[in-house]
Swiss-Prot record:
Cysteine pairs bridged by disulfides in the record: none
Stated name of the protein: Probable transcriptional regulatory protein Syncc9605_2132
Subcellular location: Cytoplasm
PANTHER family: TRANSCRIPTIONAL REGULATORY PROTEIN YEBC-RELATED (PTHR12532:SF6), TRANSLATIONAL ACTIVATOR OF CYTOCHROME C OXIDASE 1 (PTHR12532)
Amino acid sequence: MAGHSKWSQIKRTKAVVDAKRGAVFTRLGREIMVAARAGADPAGNFQLRTAISKARAAGVPASNIERAIAKGSGQAGDGAQLEDVRYEGYGPGGMAVLVEALTDNRNRTAADLRLAFSKNGGNLGENGCVAYLFEHRSEVILNAGPDDEERLLESLLELDADGYELLDGAVVVHGPFEALESLQDGLRHADWNVREWGHHWSAQTSVSVNDPETARSCLKLLDALDGLDDVRSVSANLDLADELEID
């Protein structure tokens, strides 16, 4: 499958295990604020419903969620001027990196990213230098396993999906960017336990890394970028060899 990489699986695990709780709350609150610009009612705002669902899954208190909605929709009178920004660069071994950020200060965010790249063997590039290597797509994660594969295939025949991956304790369903809402709704209606959903950048070509030291350097850079307060997501075309031993 195009864009498959062990980094994707590592990233999902680390997002749960390693994330600092306060930073996660701040990041998710910002996503809610941006989504709420299109309307404070989740029933008519799919982006807001998605952001709220992610926040609840991460344990964000209801009061924080309500406050973020009020700020973003202007009800609190102090709506933050946040904007989505995309940055691109290279890491060790020629790894392409795409970073999505949500910021109220582009200069600060760019400086933080540039420092993280330079300290970890990479460099921040110009807009467009690696974006062509990625495709923006939909992703729905189900609580399911290999035993459910036959029923899953039957469900996907009725939906706008074009692939899936079996992971430990989960199934990741892929589809076109514009199909996210219909895809997750359809899976719910087919009685699947939907864990999370969202858009992600799928690498169309990958950089294979077989050297443990290079692999560690790549992961160190990706972790450093993902740990920055303004960063929403980090995507890379890193493909780690299955037999690779990483401390």
